[in-house]
Regions:
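N-terminal module-boundary/linker segments of secreted carbohydrate-active enzymes
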Residues: 17-63
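Conserved short secondary-structure elements within globular domains
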Residues: 101-128
Length: 159
């Protein structure tokens, strides 16, 4: 019994302040996504397969903040766990807003150093859908952690 209770107790203490609420895409979030150009008919994933998370994270000053992100339902529990682990070690996140807040512009979201996931778009330099279009890729602090092309090029000067 002690073997079971001790890990549960330690996990509970470690994540006592961490919160992450998961929900389906509500009509309000759907409206934001459509008006913000991050989802439209023809995207490879229907809205019913996406989940909205409100996640507590730490900023670069160590303050607790609430952010939001959308991911595929198949990875939502893993994403919640990973962000819990990041919270526990004090890993800072500049901001976490939906790409819709940047009119679906990956460029603008990155320039704002915004941590984001779902965005229905083509992969950089490709005609194929990006992993972000499936809600299965996350950019965390993209200025500090930039996308680097195969040739070693970084597109954002602040990176």
């Amino acid at each position: 019994m002690k073997r079971i209770l001790l890990p549960i107790l330690l996990w509970t203490i470690a994540y006592a302040d961490y919160t992450a609420d998961i929900s389906s895409i509500t009509p309000q979030i759907k409206k934001r996504m459509i008006e913000g150009h991050s989802w439209r008919k023809g995207c490879p994933v229907p809205l019913k397969n996406l989940r909205y998370l409100q996640i507590k994270h730490r900023d670069f000053k160590g303050n607790d903040k609430m952010g939001e992100i959308i991911v595929h339902k198949d990875v939502v529990l893993e994403v919640k766990k990973i962000f819990g682990e990041l919270y526990e070690i004090g890993y800072p996140i500049r901001k976490m807003r939906l790409v819709s807040d940047y009119k679906g512009s990956d460029w603008q979201s990155i320039e704002a150093d915004n941590t984001s996931a779902f965005n229905c778009r083509k992969a950089t330099g490709s005609k194929n859908w990006s992993k972000h279009s499936y809600g299965k890729a996350i950019d965390i602090n993209p200025i500090e952690n930039p996308y680097i092309s195969r040739s070693g090029r970084i597109s954002h000067k602040a990176s």
